[in-house]
């Protein structure tokens, strides 16, 4: 009896008719194959075309979705990453933080710098022998990451470094 109503209002506009936020994963590709990673990087789903992504983001805006969060795979391995950032910012969805393990080239750094978005660089070690064990990367990865960190530090990009400690990289040696 308590919840028995004579009339229900289905006409009044509700505050939220769509999700408040959307988590979007442009790809599940990664430059590393970390020993601690739980992501399914073996499955290669069909990626949405950039036109489909544009439609998706614009529909989210029309539905008054408040936030679109980017996750991945590695963001910089998505071929249209710059265009995606332009689109998100244009539609009012500027990401707060982009995370990567890619040793960024000067060209990528220069392009990313214009967006004024914080960058999180994942660095589990700068020792080539350790990164080869922990990340399953080639011997040049550590050298390239070291140079990328210097280049990022010399830029205007706000950044932070994240590290996952394992029994392989748990010392300062």
What role is predicted for each listed range?
Residues 1-44, 61:
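N-terminal pre-core extensions flanking Radical SAM catalytic domains
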């Amino acid at each position: 009896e308590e919840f028995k109503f004579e009339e229900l209002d289905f006409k009044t506009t509700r505050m939220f008719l769509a999700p408040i936020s959307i988590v979007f994963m442009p790809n599940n590709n990664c430059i590393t194959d970390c020993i601690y990673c739980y992501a399914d990087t073996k499955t290669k789903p069909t990626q949405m075309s950039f036109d489909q992504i544009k439609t998706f983001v614009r529909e989210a805006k029309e539905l008054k979705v408040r936030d679109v969060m980017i996750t991945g795979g590695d963001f910089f391995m998505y071929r249209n990453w710059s265009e995606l950032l332009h689109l998100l910012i244009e539609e009012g969805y500027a990401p707060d933080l982009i995370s990567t393990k890619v040793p960024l080239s000067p060209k990528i750094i220069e392009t990313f710098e214009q967006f004024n978005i914080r960058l999180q660089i994942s660095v589990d070690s700068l020792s080539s022998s350790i990164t080869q064990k922990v990340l399953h990367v080639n011997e040049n990865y550590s050298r390239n990451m070291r140079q990328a960190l210097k280049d990022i530090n010399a830029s205007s990009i706000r950044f932070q470094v994240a590290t996952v400690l394992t029994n392989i990289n748990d010392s300062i040696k």
